[in-house]
Amino acid sequence: MIKKIFSWFESRIDPYPEAAPKTPEKGLWRFIWSNIEGVRKWIAVLAVFTVGVGIMEALMFQFMGKVVDWLGAYTPQTLFVEKGHALIGMMAMVAFFAVWTFFASCVRLQTLQGVFPMRLRWNFHRLMLGQSLGFYQDEFAGRVSAKVMQTALALRDVVMTVADMVVYVLVYFITSGVILSSFDVWLILPFICWMIGFAMIMRFLIPKLGKTAARQADARSLMTGRITDAYSNIATVKLFSHGAREAAYAKQSMEEFMVTVHAQMRLATLLHTCSFIVNSSLTVGTTALGIWLWYHGQVGVGAVATATAMALRVNGLSQYIMWESARLFENIGTVNDGMATLSKPHTILDKPQALPLKVTRGEIKFEHVDFSYEAGKPLLNGFNLNIKPGEKVGLIGRSGAGKSTIVNLLLRFYEPQSGTISIDGQTVDSVTQESLRAQIGLVTQDTSLLHRSVRDNIIYGRPDATEAEMISAAERAEAAGFIPNLSDAKGRRGYDAHVGERGVKLSGGQRQRIAIARVMLKDAPILLLDEATSALDSEVEAAIQESLDKMMEGKTVIAIAHRLSTIAAMDRLIVLDKGRIIEEGSHTELLAKQGLYAKLWAHQSGGFLSEHVEWENN
């Protein structure tokens, strides 16, 4: 029975809603309000239960005071005769209070405490997946993930503190005030003095705790980001023997974090001391005033007992209120810190009327495209390029000429400032991003694999592919030879072996062959190769080239390579400099022109593009 009740409450909120999350509004309370959509009803239910808990707890003290009066007014023989029904009613009230508290706990713990932050993480994660590449070039991946996790918990705690602690305290104090004034209005005086003193502590110390918490959250994110950055690039750290340097780099952020920790602990000590002084004054003042009123016959013993018990309860509550308030401001600081990242609007969005891309021929057009990564530093200016259906085009140029930028714009990783880019007459900004990238296969020199199995990484290209199709792609990519010999720390082997973060357990050539297998399995009509074989040795490259040639049949291809021999057989070669086309034609045509391409071909060393050739500004 209990398990069924728990299960019912646990299933009231869907932790993984299918609806696409909306970018939260900026401003603390607007941010919180937009993120509690779908759970507001249960937050209100929790508040209602909390109101009941506050009222019933205050009434319990009143009942205890009455019992004290009855014990003084009746003998053991007459007490149960005269007040038996009242005592039974009191016991029934206690039983009802227990049931009420149980269901309040179910709402708090089963419905909200665990499920609500998971719902937030799910939505935040999907929001971050929708951010552009430019966003992640300005942010530590570790820092973003830390904010997703921390902000979800902090936002949950802010909401539940308000719905639970704040509501409970207000209701408890109001009910207690009514009860005490029914005995004698003077009994409220110590509580009013306590509230003034407590409010002053809250006014001066709690906001400082909140500001310190905000600095601490930022320092924690920075520390996490730096540590994660070192782990993510451990090969580079080892290669340059910079373990000590990275430790010092992380230590700097740890020291900054410790500054905020010490500041927080100093405030906590002041808070504890001031709280003790105010609480002790309340207990002593209430007891003394109660005795004085009893001495003058204005209240009975039960009223003194009730007031003293309430003062002791407030004494205990004050620690709860103080630290919950401190946590509230700390969590508000964390939410504010996370809000700066999580509420950033997506810079690249699908239009409301966006349709799926339909590739029928594979014609690609760049028309009057202007683009710059930084304002005032144009990379492409009035750029035009027409790639015919099924044409194989090679892009040549030194670093920074705009080759990879053309690829990134076609994939709509970035938006041009002006001009249009289209595929088969459909502009890339008028179709959905998912459908656009689903029709394009990309292999780059900087191949990153997911920290999953080899099978998962290959089948990522087409999740509905069969095992046989996946293995066939690995064979065509010359990867089937080494995959059976792979193993990981957990004993998984072959296609089940995990490749490590970003594929760190594999060699560069192995990573690139798995990436090529992934694209072969995807079999998209448009193929982009950005130094696709740069990490392969000559023997493997020669073996895989035939498979690449077969894969390129019937596809529109854009290939980038510094090693000119790898793209010399393309239908058309385009030489770029500073975002402009300065030569184009087939390999034979360009050699016959005796222009820049011919000089590059002649000056190649080992087949690679020389950076020492004088670039012409035609």
PLM features per residue range, with description:
Residues M1-E57, G72-M90, A104-Q113, R126, ...:
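Membrane-integrated ABC transporters
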Residues P15-E25, M56-G72, M93-A141, S145, ...:
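Juxtamembrane helix-loop junctions of ABC transporter transmembrane domains
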Residues E25, W29, A44-V45, R121, ...:
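Alpha-helical membrane-protein architecture signal
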Residues E37-G38, L133-G134, Q150-V159, A163, ...:
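An intracellular "coupling" helix at the cytosolic face of ABC transporter transmembrane type-1 domains
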Residues G38, W42-G52, F97-A98, T161-R215, ...:
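Transmembrane helices of ABC transporter permease
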Residues A73-T75, G89, I179-I196, L267-N336, ...:
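Helix-loop-helix
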Residues M128, A250, F366-H368:
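Conserved catalytic Walker-motif region of ABC-type ATPase nucleotide-binding domains
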Residues L357-N618:
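ABC-type nucleotide-binding domain
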